[in-house]
Amino acid sequence: MGDVIVSISDFRVSNNVGDILVTYALGSCIAVAIYDPKVKVGGLLHYMLPDSSLDVDKAKTTPGMFADTGIPLLFKACYSLGAQKKSMIVKVAGGASILDDTNFFRIGQKNIMMARKMFWKNNVLINGEDTGSNCNRTVRLEIKTGKVFVKSSGGPLREL
């Protein structure tokens, strides 16, 4: 019970109404929060890179590092706790341009586009989004309510 920390390149799921899934220091990374209100099951993924083809070996050992391997695993883990795709509420945050002032690598932008592409291809609606800009974010998912809160560096905690 309480805060369950989701590290970079990892995900957590829960059906414990006392849990709050939290991930910190989202820069160019993306947090994907999913929640099924019918069964009160939620999950939070903190991925770093858009595409596992960048490092196939790493994707095998750390699938949460990549959007294309982490997002499907997040959904499957929630399904194993009774969640259903048709009931899922999906919220996305992150994808900032923190250390890339010239916007040369555009990792944040590529991460955002991969999430949108994957959800679109799988007929999943993104219900809330706080992406881009140049600020770090913290994301919290309350399992009891399904509410997702985002705190940008220097800003207040607000519901997404």
Swiss-Prot record:
CDD domains xref list: CheD (cd16352)
InterPro entries membership: CheD-like_sf, Chemorcpt_Glu_NH3ase_CheD, Cytotoxic_necrot_fac-like_cat
Function of the molecule: Probably deamidates glutamine residues to glutamate on methyl-accepting chemotaxis receptors (MCPs), playing an important role in chemotaxis.
Organism of derivation: Syntrophus aciditrophicus (strain SB)
Primary enzyme class: hydrolase
Enzyme Commission numbers on file: 3.5.1.44
Record PANTHER family: CHEMORECEPTOR GLUTAMINE DEAMIDASE CHED-RELATED (PTHR35147:SF1)
Any one GO BP annotation for this protein: chemotaxis
Transmembrane segment boundaries: none
Family recorded in the similarity comment: Belongs to the CheD family.
Name this protein carries in UniProt: Probable chemoreceptor glutamine deamidase CheD 1
